[in-house]
């Protein structure tokens, strides 16, 4: 119930703020996939692989995920990917198995990587190589690989990323909130590396408003580059749309409005005063608008929101869900506090 309700809340928030497709990696991926299809949003569901410290073997996670992959083969709305929360927690045998399946089935591999300063030293001490070097050794750094965060990287790392054609998902709001640093987007783009934009989870970021995050990544990138002309509004919007589709290996079907692609698009109410002036529309959207300005959302030509009203899920149900879990969590906190006082 927790994952099902959380998925409903998160998907609703994303639709309300203009997201038509998202990538996910969490427990019970079959539940998340079912909710996404029920609501009608497009998704790439990552099935997580953990080590035995989670109470289950890595093999069981892999085979459960492959069952989900098989069930989604003919789904237009849902794709799947391997998802690795911590590279340092998995042994090389497990990672090699993931690489083998990924190559055989043409499955993407999504990895949270270089999210903090200790990852490199832990990898070197435990496995004898840096994280990216280890991925290369195991055949996991390839054009199907999605690396989220990548904030603690140097010139050597950037060259490895370029040489192997993988994709970066920058999550600046989460990184800043947790005081972890900032992905060197300018350097990555200058080296021709594809960078998409993400929000991270509500646990790390609180907000899933990707449109609002575009402004933050734009201003930070300009600030670090010390060049106000670098990374303009159009480039910023592309990072949140087509670049993201490329990272998911979905660019032939989504990411831009073109003949032959799915009709996934949104409408932004530019009559709102925060969007003025509109002489440069890309600039108005990036610097003046936020997710609250989105009025309509379509996925595959189907309306998921019209005039700011969700069409495939009842907002009254969402209110009930939040109230239910608020009460449960409050009770749990009170119980824990009471036990500590015994």
Residue ranges and their predicted role:
Residues 1-40, 63-74, 323-334:
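Alpha-helical scaffold segments that flank or form the walls of functional sites
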Residues 39-43, 101-108, 140-143, 160-169, ...:
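Glycine-enriched alpha-helix->loop->beta-strand junction motifs that scaffold or abut catalytic
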Residues 117-129, 155-162, 179-188, 205-222:
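Histidine/acidic-residue-rich catalytic or RNA/ligand-binding cores of hydrolases
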């Amino acid at each position: 119930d927790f994952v099902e309700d959380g998925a409903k809340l998160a998907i609703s928030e994303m639709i309300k703020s203009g997201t038509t497709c998202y990538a996910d990696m969490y427990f019970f991926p079959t539940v998340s996939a079912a909710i996404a299809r029920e609501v009608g949003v497009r998704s790439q569901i990552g099935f997580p692989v953990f080590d035995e410290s989670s109470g289950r073997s890595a093999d069981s996670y892999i085979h459960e995920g492959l069952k989900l992959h098989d069930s989604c083969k003919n789904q237009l709305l849902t794709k799947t990917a391997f998802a690795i929360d911590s590279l340092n927690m998995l042994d090389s045998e497990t990672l090699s198995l993931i690489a083998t399946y990924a190559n055989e089935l043409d499955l993407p591999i999504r990895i949270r990587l270089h999210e903090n300063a200790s990852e490199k030293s832990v990898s070197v001490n435990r496995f004898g190589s840096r994280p990216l070097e280890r991925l290369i050794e195991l055949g996991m750094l390839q054009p199907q690989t999605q690396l989220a965060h990548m904030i603690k990287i140097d010139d050597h790392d950037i060259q490895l990323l370029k040489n192997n054609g993988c994709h970066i998902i920058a999550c600046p709001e989460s990184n800043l909130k947790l005081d972890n640093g900032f992905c060197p987007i300018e350097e990555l783009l200058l080296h021709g590396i594809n960078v998409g934009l993400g929000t991270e989870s509500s646990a790390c970021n609180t907000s899933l408003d990707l449109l609002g995050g575009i402004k933050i990544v734009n201003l930070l990138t300009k600030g670090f580059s010390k060049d106000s002309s670098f990374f303009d509004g159009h480039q910023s919007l592309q990072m949140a749309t087509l670049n993201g589709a490329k990272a998911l290996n979905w660019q032939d079907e989504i990411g831009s409005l073109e003949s032959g692609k799915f009709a996934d698009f949104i409408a932004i109410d530019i009559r709102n005063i925060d969007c003025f002036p509109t002489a440069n529309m890309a600039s108005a959207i990036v610097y003046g608008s936020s997710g609250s300005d989105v009025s309509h959302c379509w996925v595959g030509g189907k309306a998921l929101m019209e005039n700011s009203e969700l069409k495939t899920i009842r907002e009254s149900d969402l209110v009930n869900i939040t109230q239910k879990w608020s009460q449960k969590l409050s009770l749990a906190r009170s119980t824990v506090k009471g036990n500590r006082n015994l």
